[in-house]
Amino acid sequence: MAGRVKIKQKELIDSTVKNKNVMNLFHEIIGSKGNINFSVVWPKFKKIKQSVYDYISTLSVLEKASVMQNFEDDKKLLELFVQKLWAAYEGYFKYPEIEKYEVEGQVNFNLVPQYVLEKFSQLYRIRINSELVTLILNSCAFMSKYNDYILKKDPYILTITPGLCFSPIPNFEDLNFKHLYNSDKNSQHDKDFIMFILYKLYTAALGVYNAISIPDIDVEDLENIILSSVSQIKKQIPRCKDAFNKIESSVHLLRKNFNTYYSDYVGSGYNPTIIMEQYIKDISQDSKNISPRISYQFRTIIKYYRDMIATKHQTMDPQVLNLVKHVEKKLDMLDREKN
């Protein structure tokens, strides 16, 4: 039954490709034009939200813990900081619109009002790129340098790190774990508790990082888009069979390297063309035996796209233009290697 669903899904994509500009469809799948795949993005958003909540809650537990009674000034500063984090959390993450339509953790998005989906789409990128999430990701990056020690709750980390301060939160050096841990006022139980808090803070930050790293799209849908578009275009461009076969046979590289492509996509400011750039680059690097004939066929395919755009009197998207230039540059390099 599952196989049949996949077949129907591919048939739908094939039909859609016939009736839509391929690049527009690619943009839609990626979500760069405001369209997002709710079945993928909503679970991702929930994981980010939960991990952000866990991160702030950990700091809140520390602030209220008896051990902080020994550090009155630090306690007051931490209390104010936690209040600011909770206020930011309320502003970015307390939007129960879609949650109201959940049944046993699942959402039928066909039953969610369009205005609710549109509002979530508009705010999604703002939320995951917020100062709050960025702070936690920076905190994670700092602690990841000491991954093994923190996960083992090994206090040796507070000895080997240079300086008098070990603060895992950017721009908040008042939370100094060296100062807290090394105080003569602490019992061994207090010291163990402080290391446990550091451990919980790191695992929560890792949760945010891991959730953020989840692609916003279904990779299989993207593969089907590429294969279906190639299937349509090859009928209109004769004598380029070898180049098309190379593209079709290399789709496995998309799935294999997609996590890297997606990281580049996020790092580029959500430029979807970067995925195709890296994909084509990998095809060329994986194809050391591309002949001048196949190189010529690739150029013919590129020319087809240019002519199609010119015929329709459309201005080429700068991102698409960069992609075309990148492919041509790669082909030039391959040609030079052959000579």
UniProtKB/Swiss-Prot annotation:
GO terms for cellular component: host cell cytoplasm; host cell nucleus. It is found in: Host cytoplasm; Host nucleus. Induction: Expressed in the late phase of the viral replicative cycle. The keyword tRNA processing does not apply. It comes from African swine fever virus (isolate Tick/South Africa/Pretoriuskop Pr4/1996). Interacts with host NACA (alpha chain of nascent polypeptide-associated complex). Transmembrane segments: none annotated. This is Protein H339R. Belongs to the asfivirus H339R family. The keyword DNA-binding does not apply. Keywords: Host cytoplasm, Host nucleus, Host-virus interaction, Late protein.
